[in-house]
Amino acid sequence: MFIISGRTMLKKAQQEGYAVPAFNIHNLETLQVVVETAAELRSPLIVAGTPGTFSYAGVGNIVAIAAELAKSWNHPLAVHLDHHEKLADIKMKVAAGVRSVMIDGSHFPFADNIALVKSVVDYCHRYDVSVEAELGRLGGQEDDLIVDGKDALYTHPEQAREFVEKTGIDSLAIAIGTAHGLYTAEPKLDFERLTEIRQRVDVPLVLHGASGLPTRDITRAISLGICKVNVATELKIAFSGALKNYLTQHAEASDPRHYMIPAKAAMKEVVRKVIADCGCDGKL
């Protein structure tokens, strides 16, 4: 089996003090880049897709391509549902072969968030599917969901303890000052809050909104208990920027086999840097 649950890889990261990168992908080329690079560096790997990505590319297509790439590189990986909100949607994608999910009920009141997450955990654990959930809200935009900065909420440490105990989740995404998208100013992460959460919660902790974070912040967050680091926007910008630049310089270009090469190369450099920041090269 080359498509696996994220549970074991995150537990290993927690025990050994590194983080597993979760790279948001969209199509064949972006999947090729992350699997190839992770395999070359022997890094554990999670490939993530939002509901919009799965609608665009097709869940069956993503799972099939990921499985074939994982097999050809002899590199097990997790295909992960990022920021999914509906149990019925998750059930359909689990049936299609996904083994790692994030249920996002962070926009609901605390009790309703618990109830939704618990229903997903009860279903997914029957099929050895790992479940991540979010407590607190990140600002910025993820897919079609936009959260204004004033509506972002940090994770409360004591609520985190109760949330994990009542839901039975495998990992917890927390809000400590990161945001989706690129930062207009350097973020100030609440490392004290992260420490307090880690003291109360024994499951692996997840950091969303890592695109553009300084290496020192990622390294410190990992040292304080972060076990999974999500990167999306930085990958898209590298890929699309190189593609636009190539087409600007080669107006006659019409062959995707040519103009995708620099786009993939630019994205690969970001993937390599994130793996280095996570300290997970050679950890597969």
UniProtKB/Swiss-Prot annotation:
It comes from the Bacteria. Zn(2+) binds at residues 83, 180, 208. The active site is at 82 (proton donor). One of its GO terms (cellular component) is cytosol. Binds 1 zinc ion per subunit. GO terms for molecular function: tagatose-bisphosphate aldolase activity; zinc ion binding. Belongs to the class II fructose-bisphosphate aldolase family. TagBP aldolase GatY subfamily. Catalytic subunit of the tagatose-1,6-bisphosphate aldolase GatYZ, which catalyzes the reversible aldol condensation of dihydroxyacetone phosphate (DHAP or glycerone-phosphate) with glyceraldehyde 3-phosphate (G3P) to produce tagatose 1,6-bisphosphate (TBP). Requires GatZ subunit for full activity and stability. Is involved in the catabolism of galactitol. This is D-tagatose-1,6-bisphosphate aldolase subunit GatY. It comes from Salmonella newport (strain SL254). The gene is gatY.
